[in-house]
């Protein structure tokens, strides 16, 4: 995919940050020395970590140059690293590994979660949140439109960039032997948005990118028009004209 677009991502900053707040609220650590924000994006989640633990050394890690530019502007006093989590190791003595909406994009992410959890000292925390929405209409419609002409050839591999998440029982069996405490839960958010076009704008910043990035501008416009029409049918307006975007997410908090 092309580089992430921080401006597009931040169009729904409040809604995207809420799961990070909910995840952070369940992290039991009171006074960590070192904290790492994996997949820090534009720094919205990193800011929460800095706010909660102002005395800690907080670093952010991301693969996107544009996201890191925004994060550095937001938090110039903190360190941000461009790195792929699959090849990155946290600094020795890191107490909290925080990952908001990143591991769904990481191939074989369960292996990576085990690796990171194994490297923590006793009492260290791995806190993870991932969208679990591939079976929602917002994402089903992406794949359905991509199978149609004239996009079928260019987008045949788009859906392969993100796998369906394992069941909670799979995460439990993989992670529990490595930690003293493990909490796993789902939360379903219902975001009130201004209409089907707002849903499209939301997913253009994340899940829709593998489907539109490969397309030239004319093909992208026709794809988005077809996709928007399906979204309008799948998400009817409420009494006040808003639409509700149902958004399930899985949360994992593991204490070493």
UniProtKB/Swiss-Prot annotation:
GO cellular component: cytoplasm
Subcellular location field: Cytoplasm
GO terms under biological process: methylation
Transmembrane regions: none
Top-level taxonomic group: Bacteria
Catalytic activity: trans-aconitate + S-adenosyl-L-methionine = (E)-3-(methoxycarbonyl)pent-2-enedioate + S-adenosyl-L-homocysteine
Main location: cytoplasm
Keywords per UniProt: Cytoplasm, Methyltransferase, S-adenosyl-L-methionine, Transferase
Pfam families: Methyltransf_25
EC number: 2.1.1.144
Cross-referenced SUPFAM superfamilies: S-adenosyl-L-methionine-dependent methyltransferases
Cysteine disulfide links: none
GO MF terms held by the record: trans-aconitate 2-methyltransferase activity
InterPro entries hit by this protein: Methyltransf_25 (IPR041698), SAM-dependent_MTases_sf (IPR029063), Trans-aconitate_MeTrfase (IPR023506), Trans_acon_MeTrfase_C (IPR023149)
Function: Catalyzes the S-adenosylmethionine monomethyl esterification of trans-aconitate.
Similarity field: Belongs to the methyltransferase superfamily. Tam family.
The protein, known as: Trans-aconitate 2-methyltransferase
Organism: Rhodopseudomonas palustris (strain TIE-1)
Encoding gene (name): tam
């Amino acid at each position: 995919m092309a580089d992430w677009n921080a401006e597009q991502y931040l169009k729904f900053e409040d809604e995207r940050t809420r799961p990070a707040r909910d995840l952070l609220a369940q992290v039991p650590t009171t006074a960590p020395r070192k904290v790492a924000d994996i997949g820090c994006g534009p720094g919205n989640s990193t800011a929460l970590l800095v706010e909660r633990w102002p005395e800690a050394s907080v670093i952010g890690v991301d693969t996107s140059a544009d996201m890191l530019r925004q994060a550095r502007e937001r938090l110039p006093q903190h360190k941000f690293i461009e790195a792929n989590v699959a090849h990155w190791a946290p600094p020795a003595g890191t107490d909290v590994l925080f990952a908001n909406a990143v591991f769904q994009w990481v191939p074989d992410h369960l292996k990576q979660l085990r690796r990171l959890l194994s490297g923590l000292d006793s009492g260290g925390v791995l806190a993870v949140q991932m969208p679990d929405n591939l079976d929602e209409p917002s994402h089903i419609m992406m794949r359905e439109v991509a199978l149609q002409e004239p996009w079928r050839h260019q987008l045949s591999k788009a859906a392969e960039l993100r796998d369906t998440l394992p069941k909670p029982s799979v995460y439990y069996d993989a992670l529990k032997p490595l930690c003293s405490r493990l909490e796993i839960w789902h939360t379903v958010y219902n975001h009130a948005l201004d209409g089907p076009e707002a849903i499209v704008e939301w997913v253009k910043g994340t899940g829709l990118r593998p489907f539109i990035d490969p397309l030239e501008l004319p093909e992208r416009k026709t794809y988005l028009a077809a996709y928007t029409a399906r979204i309008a049918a799948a998400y009817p307006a409420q009494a006040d004209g808003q639409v509700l975007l149902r958004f399930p997410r899985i949360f994992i908090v593991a204490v070493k």
